Design a protein with these regions (language model features):
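N-terminal secretory targeting modules
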Residues: 1-54, 107-111, 116-137, 154, ...
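Serine-esterase "nucleophile elbow" of acetyl-processing enzymes
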Residues: 36-95, 100-105
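Surface-exposed cleft-lining segments at the edges of enzyme active sites
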Residues: 59-64, 89, 128-147
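Conserved beta-strand->loop/alpha-helix structural units within folded catalytic cores of enzymes
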Residues: 146-156
Length: 210
């Protein structure tokens, strides 16, 4: 617990995105990161989780740079009047997100999981989330890896709602990070699949599995 988390600290802002430093230093809302006994930025879980909404993702789900009550799981909880459990993790790759969803299904038999997928270039290598996998690098590889994770969770016997992080955030990134915002034109992935996933990623479209 503390006032900073991951990229949400003045040192990172000064080094990586100095043009935002004034905004950072004059942000009007008080930000504090408090984690529950399971290691997530959320209140303690209720004893009965049979009818909760499970929210899985990266720092966008955790609510990096936001008060806890303004994270999207917290807002969803207010809108639905149902307990929404925040399983956001700073820097989580889609590999980690998919593994977490499968574990939730195995342990809790959930009724509904909402996934906010992360950037395609992030990978889980040797059990650690990294910015990219140098041994499996590029747009085609990233899309194939994403589809692997997408299919793995979409085959689970529960309702899944898919969301994505806003890729416009890459405007402040370097060339390596921008790769996942570009269209891939390799031959290994069919054009209909490419169009579907790129439309989903670009427009933050919600797709509900019935």
């Amino acid at each position: 617990s503390g006032p900073y988390s991951s990229t949400d600290n003045p040192k990172h802002t000064e080094q990586e995105t100095p043009k935002h430093l004034e905004h950072f230093n004059n942000y009007p809302k008080k930000i504090y990161y408090k984690y529950n006994s399971k290691g997530f930025r959320d209140n303690e879980w209720p004893e009965d989780v049979s009818d909760v909404i499970w929210c899985v993702g990266d720092s966008f789900t955790l609510g990096c740079g936001q008060p806890q009550n303004e994270s999207w799981p917290a807002v969803l909880e207010k809108l639905t009047n149902k307990r929404c459990i925040n399983l956001g993790q700073d820097g989580a790759s889609n590999d980690t997100i998919a593994l977490r969803v499968q574990e939730i299904q195995k342990v809790y038999n959930p009724k509904l999981i909402v996934i906010m997928w992360s950037y395609l270039h992030r990978r889980r290598v040797n059990g650690i989330d990294v910015g990219s996998d140098k041994n499996d690098f590029g747009d085609d590889a990233d899309i194939k890896n994403f589809l692997k994770n997408y299919d793995a969770v979409n085959s689970l016997p529960t309702k899944i709602i898919h969301l994505t992080v806003p890729l416009s955030m890459y405007n402040d990134g370097d060339e390596l990070m921008k790769q996942s915002e570009r269209t891939a034109y390799g031959n290994e992935i069919s054009e209909p699949i490419k169009k579907k996933i790129l439309f989903l990623m670009k427009n933050n479209v919600t797709e509900v599995k019935q």
